[in-house]
Amino acid sequence: MTSTVPAETSLNKFEKLKSEKDGLAVKSELEDFARLGWEAMDETDRDHRLRWMGVFFRPVSQGKFMLRMRIPNGILTSGQIRVLAEVVERYGEDGNADITTRPNLQLRGIRLEDIPDIFRRFEQAGLTSIQSGMDNVRNITGSPVAGIDADELIDTRGLVRKVQDMITNNGEGNPSFSNLPRKFNIAIAGCRDNSVHAEINDIAFVPAYKDGKLGFNVLVGGFFSAKRCEAAVPLNAWVDPRDVVALCEAILIVYRITGCGANRQKSRLMWLIDEWGMDKFRAEVEQQLGHPLQTAAPKDEILWDKRDHIGIHAQKKPGLNYVGLLVPVGRLYAPMFDLARIAEVYGDGEMRLTVERKRDHSRTCPMSSVASLLKEPLLEKFSVSPGLLVRSLVSCTGAQFCNFALIETKNRAMALIRELESELELARPVRIHWTGCPNSCGQPQVADIGLMGTKVRKDGKATEGVDLYMGGKVGKHAELGTCVQKGIPCDDLKPILRNLLIEHFGARPK
C-alpha cells in the first residue's frame, strides 16, 4: 500500500504535535505533571496529549479536568462503581459523572494532582481510561443486555473485550493505534433491534446468517461531524465471530497508513472510502488480512424497532429478571454508591449502561426481590416507569462543562420536558435529542426530534438557539434525520415542540 501521509511541511497543528511526541508518552510523566500543576506544565501536553490518557483540560472549568473512561460493552461491577463513586465524591459539588452515548462514563471535577492516585485505584479495580480521547478508537459498543437477553443472537461481551484488548494492548496503551488520522468508533450488535446504532459507527458488525451459520455483516464509514454526517455503508463482507478482531485490526491498519489527517474536517474513514471507492477499500483490507473476505449474507437480522430496556424484563435464565432504570439526561451524582449497593443486594453486582437511552441496568433475582427493589428510595429519582418524553430524552454535556457547546443543554432539556409532560398526554415515547454544537455528541440526527445548539439573534441581541432536525430512525430501516428549521431561539422553542408533538406524534392536551 502507498502511504498518503502528508509531508511535514503540510502538517496541521494536531498532526505536528503527534509527530513530535506520541500521546501515550505522557503516561510515564503523570507523576511529574501532578507535582508541577496544570498551570506550570507544557500547554501542548496539558491541552492535547493528556487526552491519550483520557484526561481532558477544560477551559470553562480551569483546574478541573474531565476524565473519560473505557467501559467495554458498558458493563461495570459494583466494586468498579464504588471506585468511580469515590473519585467523584472527593470533589464535592464539583464532582459528577455523565453517562455518554457510547455507552461510557465521563467524570468531572478531577484535579490533576490526584491523577496518579486515581489511576492506581483504577488499575486495582480493572478500570482504564487509556486511549479514550483524540485520534484513537473510542469505547467499543455492544448490546446492553448481552448474555442475559432471552432473544439475543450473539453474546457480544467477549468480542467487545477482545477488540478493546487488541486496540489498547490489554489496557497498557498501544502505539500501533495511537496515531489514527481521526477518532474511530466500533460497534458490535448481538440482538435484532440495533441497540448499538450500527449506522453511525466507522465499523459496525450486525448479526446475519450465511449458509445457516450465524456471523456478522459488516458496515463501514458511519460518522457525525460539524462538516458532514453519513450513515455507514455495507462493506459487502460477512465474517465469522472468530474473525471480528482480525478484521478490525486490518481496517485500522489500512486507515492508519493511508488515511489523510492533513484536513481534520475530511479525515474520518468515510472520506477515504469516498476517495478510493468501496471496491478498492475492500481490496486493501483483504490484502492486509492476507485472505479474501466472504461476501455479505443476503440480509441481516436487524428486524425489530429499537427496544427501550426500561422497566422489568425477563432474562434468558428462567426465573431471573433485569430492571432498566432511567438516569435523566445521563447525569449521576451521589447515587453511584446506592447503585452499587442495589446491584449487589438484588442482583449479581453488575450494572450496565446503554447507548441512546443512557440508562442503568441491574440484573436481579426472582420477582419477590424485584418487588423490594421497586420500593428503594433511589427509584424515585431513577424511575423504572418514567414519562414518555423524559424516558427517551438524550442530551450532550452542554455549555456548563464543554467549551465547544454553544448552548446550555441538560438543565434546559429537563425543564422543558417536564413542562411538556405536564401539559400533554402522549401515546408513545418520542425521542428528543439535544446537542450543544455541530459536533453532534447528542446525536440529533438519529432522533425523532433533534435540537442542535447555535447562536441566533432575537430583538437585535445574540441569544442561545437551536436548529431543528426531524426524521431520524433507529432499529430496522435506520435513517438519519435532516434539518427542517434553523435558528429557533431557545426561549421560543416550547410552543414549537408542543405543536410538533401534537401534529406529528399524536399527543393531546391534558
From Swiss-Prot:
GO molecular function, one term: metal ion binding
Its EC number(s): 1.7.7.1
Reaction it catalyzes: 6 oxidized [2Fe-2S]-[ferredoxin] + NH4(+) + 2 H2O = nitrite + 6 reduced [2Fe-2S]-[ferredoxin] + 8 H(+)
Keywords recorded for this protein, A-Z: 4Fe-4S, Electron transport, Heme, Iron, Iron-sulfur, Metal-binding, Nitrate assimilation, Oxidoreductase, Transport
Binding site for [4Fe-4S] cluster: 396, 402, 437, 441
Matches recorded under Gene3D superfamilies: 3.90.480.20, Sulfite Reductase Hemoprotein, domain 1
PROSITE patterns (UniProt xref): NIR_SIR
Domain of life per record: Bacteria
List of residues binding siroheme: 441
BP term (GO), one: nitrate assimilation
NCBIfam families associated with the record: PRK09566.1
PANTHER family named in the record: FERREDOXIN--NITRITE REDUCTASE, CHLOROPLASTIC (PTHR32439:SF0)
Family: Belongs to the nitrite and sulfite reductase 4Fe-4S domain family.
Protein name: Ferredoxin--nitrite reductase
Organism: Leptolyngbya laminosa (Phormidium laminosum)
